[in-house]
């Protein structure tokens, strides 16, 4: 997936009110960007980091610029726009870049399922195969090359795991897919130190037949693509 038009570069001054960030451009202009990430963004929003942003041609938008990537002062690229996790996963599935999810003839998005009436990110279908339900999570929290999810307690994420367990119990295929959008991450684990309940449910889900996949994106200011399977430790 290439960024078109190309992203523009700035330096982060501060992120505030969760959805806003002030930056300064190379020519000295100060801009306020929309921040499309409700999470803690730990390690992704340090003042002085390089920010790569897009600009909308929608004249009705109050904040036409959107923060897409962080390039940390250590050189790591991080995708902070959480919408990209699903876009990249869909692209990788359709391109059959994810071997575990290849061989299906149909992909549907946002399908209602489960007793708690969630919407699954993707459902794959093929003749003579069980339906495959896929829930996608974006991973940007990193410490010493270790990637973690979540970066804050997530009751919604816990609900999704319960729903996936019910899908697996019905004989369908259930997958939790961690899209790793941080170039410095080399392995993945649930963030037990942040949300112990989520970590416990993830282990239970695996025992009950839910598959756990983690794939890392190659990220640059020019584009991104999910490429590499990472080891998962529960």
UniProtKB/Swiss-Prot annotation:
Residues in the DNA-binding region annotation: 201-220
Signal sequence coordinates: none
Gene3D superfamilies documented for this protein: 2.40.50.580, 3.40.1350.60
Keywords: DNA-binding
Record keyword DNA-binding present: yes
UniProt cross-references to InterPro entries, sorted A to Z: SfsA (IPR005224), SfsA_C (IPR040452), SfsA_N (IPR041465)
This protein's record includes keyword DNA-binding: yes
Entry's Gene Ontology molecular function annotations: DNA binding
UniProt record similarity statement: Belongs to the SfsA family.
Function per UniProt: Binds to DNA non-specifically. Could be a regulatory factor involved in maltose metabolism.
NCBIfam families for this protein: sfsA (TIGR00230)
Protein name: Sugar fermentation stimulation protein A
Annotated source species: Shigella flexneri
Record gene name: sfsA
């Amino acid at each position: 997936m290439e960024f078109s038009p190309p992203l523009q570069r700035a330096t982060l001054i501060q992120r505030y009110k969760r959805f806003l960030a002030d930056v300064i451009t190379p020519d000295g202009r100060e801009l306020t960007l929309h921040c499309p990430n409700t999470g803690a963004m730990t390690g992704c929003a340090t003042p002085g980091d390089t920010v790569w942003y897009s600009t909308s041609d929608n004249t009705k938008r109050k904040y036409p610029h959107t923060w897409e990537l962080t390039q940390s002062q250590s050189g790591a690229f991080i995708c902070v726009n959480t919408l990209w996790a699903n876009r990249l996963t869909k692209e990788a599935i359709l391109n059959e870049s994810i071997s575990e999810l290849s061989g299906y003839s149909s992909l549907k998005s946002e399908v209602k399922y489960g007793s708690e009436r969630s919407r699954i990110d993707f459902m794959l279908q093929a003749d003579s195969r069980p339906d495959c339900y896929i829930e996608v999570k974006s991973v940007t929290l990193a410490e010493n090359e270790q990637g973690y999810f979540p970066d804050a307690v997530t009751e919604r994420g816990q609900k999704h795991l319960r729903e996936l367990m019910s899908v697996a119990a019905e004989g369908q295929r259930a997958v939790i897919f961690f899209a790793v959008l941080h170039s410095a991450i080399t392995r993945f684990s649930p963030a037990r130190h942040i949300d112990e309940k989520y970590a416990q449910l993830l282990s239970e889900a695996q025992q009950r037949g839910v598959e756990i996949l983690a794939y890392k994106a190659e990220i640059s200011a020019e584009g991104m693509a999910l490429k590499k399977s990472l080891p998962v430790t529960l």
